[in-house]
């Protein structure tokens, strides 16, 4: 693991070498906006803003991207809920359960699924206020997602409205699926069949499909 230092909290980023190419720019950009972000009590806390940068990208085939961390108790790992109480991850687990036939489980974590990189476009928000830091993260978010798409085969974005224009900011040609948010009404997320579509797209590109059931804990 490599380390780089910041002028503001969290003061240090520990990162995997796969992120090396953009680290200097990330540090410069963050130091410009950090004081505005840190004026608020944040979700997640600053020490968890960059947690996913410790993860390798070379072995990832799919990025599952949400727009924002949970407005309370975010862990720095997108969609993660240690006590399995967050609606978003419960809806994701329910959908995967219906696809795979796994019925009895205690939790679900996309970070445990081989080949999948969970990501949030914005890395923090003010506690209780979703997308409240969107303006501050805008340039950094674009830099990081463009970097991620150089590694993955499929970008699966959760939120039709939030990600309507995402293709316009991507410089790397990447297969992009824009689906409903897991909490969308009338089970639109499940009807979307996004997880199945991702696997079809991988197979078309001669890549192994994702075993979504690996995210379950028992």
Curated annotation (Swiss-Prot):
Its EC number is 3.2.2.27. It comes from the Viruses. SUPFAM superfamilies: Uracil-DNA glycosylase-like. GO terms for molecular function: DNA binding; uracil DNA N-glycosylase activity. It catalyses: Hydrolyzes single-stranded DNA or mismatched double-stranded DNA and polynucleotides, releasing free uracil. Belongs to the uracil-DNA glycosylase (UDG) superfamily. UNG family. This is Uracil-DNA glycosylase. It comes from Rabbit fibroma virus (strain Kasza) (RFV). The gene is UNG.
